[in-house]
Amino acid sequence: MTEPYAGCSPQESAHLREVAEAAAARSAAYLIDAFRTPMAVDHKGGPHDLVTEHDLASEAILRADLTSAVPDSAFVGEEGGRSGQGRVTWYVDPIDGTVNFSHGLAYWCVSIAAAVDDVVVAGVIAAPALAQVFAVDLDGFTVNGASAQPRRVEREVDAFVISTFPRHVDLERNGEAALHASGRLTRAFGSVRTLGSGALGLAHVAAGWADATFDLHTNAWDVAAGALMVRAGGGRYLGLRAGVTDENPTTAHLRPAYWATGGDVEYPTLREVLTGLSRDARVNGSAEPEPTYP
Protein backbone atom coordinates (compact mmCIF):
# COMPACT_ATOMS: atom_id res chain seq x y z
CA MET A 1 0.00 0.00 0.00
CA THR A 2 1.02 3.60 -0.50
CA GLU A 3 1.35 6.06 2.36
CA PRO A 4 -2.01 7.01 3.94
CA TYR A 5 -3.04 10.60 3.38
CA ALA A 6 -5.57 12.30 5.64
CA GLY A 7 -6.72 14.65 2.89
CA CYS A 8 -7.93 11.82 0.64
CA SER A 9 -9.74 8.65 1.65
CA PRO A 10 -8.94 5.29 0.03
CA GLN A 11 -12.41 5.42 -1.51
CA GLU A 12 -11.77 8.79 -3.15
CA SER A 13 -8.35 7.63 -4.33
CA ALA A 14 -9.93 4.54 -5.91
CA HIS A 15 -12.56 6.71 -7.60
CA LEU A 16 -9.89 8.99 -9.07
CA ARG A 17 -7.99 5.94 -10.29
CA GLU A 18 -11.15 4.62 -11.97
CA VAL A 19 -11.77 7.98 -13.64
CA ALA A 20 -8.18 7.99 -14.90
CA GLU A 21 -8.48 4.41 -16.17
CA ALA A 22 -11.61 5.26 -18.14
CA ALA A 23 -10.05 8.37 -19.68
CA ALA A 24 -6.83 6.52 -20.47
CA ALA A 25 -8.77 3.71 -22.14
CA ARG A 26 -10.57 6.14 -24.44
CA SER A 27 -7.34 7.91 -25.33
CA ALA A 28 -5.53 4.60 -25.82
CA ALA A 29 -8.22 3.35 -28.19
CA TYR A 30 -7.80 6.48 -30.30
CA LEU A 31 -4.00 6.25 -30.26
CA ILE A 32 -3.73 2.57 -31.12
CA ASP A 33 -5.84 3.19 -34.22
CA ALA A 34 -3.49 6.04 -35.20
CA PHE A 35 -0.29 4.12 -34.40
CA ARG A 36 1.85 3.19 -37.43
CA THR A 37 -0.23 5.29 -39.80
CA PRO A 38 0.87 8.46 -41.64
CA MET A 39 0.68 11.44 -39.29
CA ALA A 40 1.46 15.14 -39.12
CA VAL A 41 4.58 15.81 -37.05
CA ASP A 42 5.83 19.19 -35.85
CA HIS A 43 8.71 20.40 -33.66
CA LYS A 44 8.16 22.26 -30.38
CA GLY A 45 11.55 23.36 -29.08
CA GLY A 46 13.90 22.10 -31.77
CA PRO A 47 14.53 19.17 -34.11
CA HIS A 48 14.63 16.61 -31.27
CA ASP A 49 11.37 17.67 -29.57
CA LEU A 50 8.46 16.29 -31.58
CA VAL A 51 4.73 16.69 -31.29
CA THR A 52 2.19 14.92 -33.48
CA GLU A 53 -1.42 15.67 -34.28
CA HIS A 54 -2.25 12.72 -32.04
CA ASP A 55 -0.56 14.19 -28.96
CA LEU A 56 -2.94 17.11 -29.28
CA ALA A 57 -6.00 14.96 -29.92
CA SER A 58 -5.18 12.62 -27.04
CA GLU A 59 -4.77 15.54 -24.65
CA ALA A 60 -8.10 16.98 -25.75
CA ILE A 61 -9.81 13.66 -24.98
CA LEU A 62 -8.18 13.45 -21.57
CA ARG A 63 -8.87 17.06 -20.65
CA ALA A 64 -12.56 16.69 -21.51
CA ASP A 65 -13.04 13.34 -19.78
CA LEU A 66 -11.14 14.07 -16.57
CA THR A 67 -12.51 17.53 -15.91
CA SER A 68 -16.10 16.51 -16.71
CA ALA A 69 -15.87 13.50 -14.38
CA VAL A 70 -14.30 15.60 -11.60
CA PRO A 71 -15.48 19.21 -12.01
CA ASP A 72 -13.53 20.36 -8.94
CA SER A 73 -10.23 19.89 -10.72
CA ALA A 74 -7.40 21.57 -12.58
CA PHE A 75 -5.64 20.06 -15.58
CA VAL A 76 -1.91 20.26 -16.33
CA GLY A 77 -1.02 18.79 -19.72
CA GLU A 78 2.22 18.64 -21.66
CA GLU A 79 0.79 20.24 -24.77
CA GLY A 80 -1.77 22.72 -23.47
CA GLY A 81 -0.44 23.68 -20.06
CA ARG A 82 -2.68 24.38 -17.10
CA SER A 83 -6.39 25.10 -17.16
CA GLY A 84 -9.08 25.26 -14.52
CA GLN A 85 -8.73 25.14 -10.78
CA GLY A 86 -9.87 22.87 -7.98
CA ARG A 87 -8.91 20.59 -5.15
CA VAL A 88 -7.79 17.86 -7.58
CA THR A 89 -5.01 18.43 -10.10
CA TRP A 90 -4.56 16.09 -13.07
CA TYR A 91 -1.02 15.75 -14.44
CA VAL A 92 -1.26 14.34 -17.95
CA ASP A 93 1.15 13.32 -20.68
CA PRO A 94 -1.00 12.40 -23.69
CA ILE A 95 1.85 10.44 -25.30
CA ASP A 96 5.01 9.84 -23.32
CA GLY A 97 7.47 8.58 -25.91
CA THR A 98 6.26 10.66 -28.86
CA VAL A 99 9.41 9.95 -30.88
CA ASN A 100 8.83 6.21 -30.47
CA PHE A 101 5.14 6.59 -31.33
CA SER A 102 5.83 8.66 -34.44
CA HIS A 103 8.34 6.11 -35.75
CA GLY A 104 6.25 3.01 -35.05
CA LEU A 105 8.14 1.76 -31.97
CA ALA A 106 5.72 0.29 -29.42
CA TYR A 107 7.35 1.74 -26.28
CA TRP A 108 5.04 4.69 -25.53
CA CYS A 109 2.18 5.36 -23.15
CA VAL A 110 -0.49 7.66 -21.78
CA SER A 111 0.29 8.87 -18.25
CA ILE A 112 -2.30 10.34 -15.85
CA ALA A 113 -1.88 11.26 -12.18
CA ALA A 114 -4.37 12.76 -9.74
CA ALA A 115 -3.11 14.97 -6.91
CA VAL A 116 -5.29 16.11 -4.02
CA ASP A 117 -4.00 19.24 -2.30
CA ASP A 118 -0.61 18.65 -3.99
CA VAL A 119 -0.31 15.00 -2.86
CA VAL A 120 -0.44 12.44 -5.71
CA VAL A 121 -3.02 9.82 -4.71
CA ALA A 122 -3.79 7.89 -7.91
CA GLY A 123 -2.36 7.25 -11.33
CA VAL A 124 -2.61 5.26 -14.54
CA ILE A 125 -0.03 4.53 -17.21
CA ALA A 126 -1.57 2.87 -20.27
CA ALA A 127 0.67 1.33 -22.92
CA PRO A 128 -1.80 0.04 -25.52
CA ALA A 129 0.80 -1.14 -28.03
CA LEU A 130 2.21 -3.36 -25.26
CA ALA A 131 -1.26 -4.38 -23.97
CA GLN A 132 -0.36 -3.14 -20.48
CA VAL A 133 -2.20 -0.90 -18.03
CA PHE A 134 -0.41 0.09 -14.83
CA ALA A 135 -2.65 1.56 -12.11
CA VAL A 136 -2.14 2.80 -8.57
CA ASP A 137 -4.20 4.24 -5.73
CA LEU A 138 -3.81 4.39 -1.97
CA ASP A 139 -4.62 0.66 -1.74
CA GLY A 140 -1.79 -0.46 -4.01
CA PHE A 141 -0.40 -1.02 -7.51
CA THR A 142 -1.55 -3.36 -10.27
CA VAL A 143 -0.54 -4.38 -13.79
CA ASN A 144 -3.52 -5.40 -15.91
CA GLY A 145 -5.50 -5.81 -12.69
CA ALA A 146 -3.02 -8.09 -10.91
CA SER A 147 -0.99 -6.96 -7.91
CA ALA A 148 2.67 -6.31 -8.61
CA GLN A 149 5.66 -4.99 -6.74
CA PRO A 150 9.27 -3.98 -7.41
CA ARG A 151 12.22 -6.23 -6.75
CA ARG A 152 15.13 -5.42 -4.49
CA VAL A 153 18.57 -5.83 -6.08
CA GLU A 154 21.39 -4.82 -3.76
CA ARG A 155 24.43 -4.68 -6.04
CA GLU A 156 24.86 -2.32 -8.96
CA VAL A 157 26.55 -5.01 -11.01
CA ASP A 158 23.39 -7.14 -10.79
CA ALA A 159 20.93 -4.32 -11.53
CA PHE A 160 19.11 -3.61 -14.79
CA VAL A 161 18.64 0.12 -15.47
CA ILE A 162 16.41 1.80 -18.04
CA SER A 163 16.44 5.52 -18.81
CA THR A 164 16.19 8.22 -21.45
CA PHE A 165 19.85 9.26 -20.96
CA PRO A 166 21.88 10.61 -22.68
CA ARG A 167 19.76 12.80 -24.93
CA HIS A 168 20.61 15.94 -26.86
CA VAL A 169 19.48 18.07 -23.93
CA ASP A 170 21.95 16.29 -21.64
CA LEU A 171 24.78 17.09 -24.04
CA GLU A 172 23.66 20.72 -24.20
CA ARG A 173 23.55 20.98 -20.41
CA ASN A 174 26.61 18.94 -19.45
CA GLY A 175 28.70 18.58 -22.60
CA GLU A 176 31.20 15.73 -22.73
CA ALA A 177 30.57 15.04 -19.04
CA ALA A 178 27.25 13.47 -20.05
CA LEU A 179 29.03 10.96 -22.28
CA HIS A 180 31.57 10.21 -19.57
CA ALA A 181 28.71 9.67 -17.11
CA SER A 182 27.01 7.28 -19.52
CA GLY A 183 30.21 5.26 -19.69
CA ARG A 184 30.51 5.13 -15.89
CA LEU A 185 26.96 3.86 -15.52
CA THR A 186 27.38 1.29 -18.28
CA ARG A 187 30.47 -0.10 -16.55
CA ALA A 188 28.95 -0.06 -13.06
CA PHE A 189 25.59 -1.72 -13.74
CA GLY A 190 24.67 -5.10 -15.13
CA SER A 191 22.85 -3.54 -18.06
CA VAL A 192 21.70 -0.04 -19.02
CA ARG A 193 19.10 0.53 -21.73
CA THR A 194 17.80 3.78 -23.22
CA LEU A 195 14.17 3.22 -24.21
CA GLY A 196 12.62 6.67 -24.56
CA SER A 197 9.72 6.90 -22.08
CA GLY A 198 10.29 8.08 -18.53
CA ALA A 199 6.77 7.13 -17.43
CA LEU A 200 7.14 3.57 -18.68
CA GLY A 201 10.58 3.35 -17.07
CA LEU A 202 9.01 4.11 -13.69
CA ALA A 203 6.16 1.67 -14.34
CA HIS A 204 8.66 -1.07 -15.18
CA VAL A 205 10.57 -0.46 -11.95
CA ALA A 206 7.29 -0.59 -10.02
CA ALA A 207 6.39 -3.88 -11.71
CA GLY A 208 9.76 -5.48 -10.96
CA TRP A 209 10.87 -5.54 -14.59
CA ALA A 210 13.76 -3.12 -14.04
CA ASP A 211 15.78 -2.22 -10.96
CA ALA A 212 16.33 1.50 -11.46
CA THR A 213 15.48 4.34 -13.79
CA PHE A 214 16.40 8.02 -14.04
CA ASP A 215 16.08 11.19 -16.07
CA LEU A 216 17.78 14.56 -15.82
CA HIS A 217 15.18 16.49 -17.82
CA THR A 218 11.58 15.85 -16.83
CA ASN A 219 8.23 17.37 -15.88
CA ALA A 220 5.47 16.46 -13.45
CA TRP A 221 3.25 15.04 -16.19
CA ASP A 222 6.01 12.54 -17.05
CA VAL A 223 6.60 11.22 -13.54
CA ALA A 224 3.74 11.90 -11.10
CA ALA A 225 1.91 8.63 -11.77
CA GLY A 226 5.05 6.52 -12.02
CA ALA A 227 6.58 7.93 -8.85
CA LEU A 228 3.53 6.85 -6.85
CA MET A 229 3.66 3.41 -8.46
CA VAL A 230 7.28 2.92 -7.41
CA ARG A 231 6.59 4.01 -3.83
CA ALA A 232 3.46 1.83 -3.59
CA GLY A 233 5.58 -1.32 -3.47
CA GLY A 234 8.33 0.01 -1.24
CA GLY A 235 10.61 1.43 -3.92
CA ARG A 236 12.23 4.86 -3.77
CA TYR A 237 11.64 7.92 -5.93
CA LEU A 238 14.09 10.79 -5.42
CA GLY A 239 13.47 14.12 -7.08
CA LEU A 240 16.64 16.03 -7.90
CA ARG A 241 17.42 19.70 -8.37
CA ALA A 242 20.83 21.42 -8.39
CA GLY A 243 22.43 18.33 -6.87
CA VAL A 244 19.96 18.17 -3.95
CA THR A 245 17.61 15.19 -3.59
CA ASP A 246 13.98 15.32 -2.47
CA GLU A 247 11.84 12.36 -1.35
CA ASN A 248 8.89 14.43 -0.11
CA PRO A 249 5.78 13.05 -1.89
CA THR A 250 4.28 16.55 -2.18
CA THR A 251 7.26 18.00 -4.06
CA ALA A 252 9.54 15.27 -5.44
CA HIS A 253 7.52 14.88 -8.66
CA LEU A 254 7.90 18.62 -9.33
CA ARG A 255 11.71 18.47 -9.51
CA PRO A 256 13.37 18.63 -12.94
CA ALA A 257 15.34 15.38 -12.49
CA TYR A 258 15.01 12.11 -10.58
CA TRP A 259 16.05 8.57 -10.03
CA ALA A 260 14.03 5.64 -8.74
CA THR A 261 14.94 2.19 -7.43
CA GLY A 262 12.94 -0.96 -6.90
CA GLY A 263 13.65 -1.16 -3.19
CA ASP A 264 15.16 0.79 -0.35
CA VAL A 265 18.61 0.33 -1.84
CA GLU A 266 21.53 2.66 -2.44
CA TYR A 267 23.42 2.67 -5.73
CA PRO A 268 26.46 4.87 -5.03
CA THR A 269 27.54 5.28 -8.65
CA LEU A 270 24.06 6.33 -9.72
CA ARG A 271 23.79 8.86 -6.89
CA GLU A 272 27.25 10.31 -7.54
CA VAL A 273 26.78 10.59 -11.29
CA LEU A 274 23.30 12.11 -11.21
CA THR A 275 23.85 14.57 -8.38
CA GLY A 276 27.08 15.67 -10.04
CA LEU A 277 25.47 16.25 -13.42
CA SER A 278 22.51 18.03 -11.85
CA ARG A 279 24.75 20.28 -9.77
CA ASP A 280 27.19 21.06 -12.58
CA ALA A 281 24.44 21.90 -15.07
CA ARG A 282 23.07 24.48 -12.67
CA VAL A 283 26.51 25.94 -12.04
CA ASN A 284 27.08 26.24 -15.78
CA GLY A 285 23.78 28.07 -16.13
CA SER A 286 22.62 25.74 -18.88
CA ALA A 287 19.89 23.84 -17.07
CA GLU A 288 16.27 24.72 -17.49
CA PRO A 289 14.57 26.22 -14.44
CA GLU A 290 12.53 23.99 -12.21
CA PRO A 291 9.03 23.70 -13.70
CA THR A 292 6.22 25.56 -11.99
CA TYR A 293 2.49 25.01 -12.34
CA PRO A 294 0.79 28.18 -11.06
Segments and roles (model prediction):
Residues 27, 31, 55, 66, ...:
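Residue-level signal for inorganic ion chemistry
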Residues 61, 109, 225-228:
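Short amphipathic alpha-helical face segments that pack within enzyme cores
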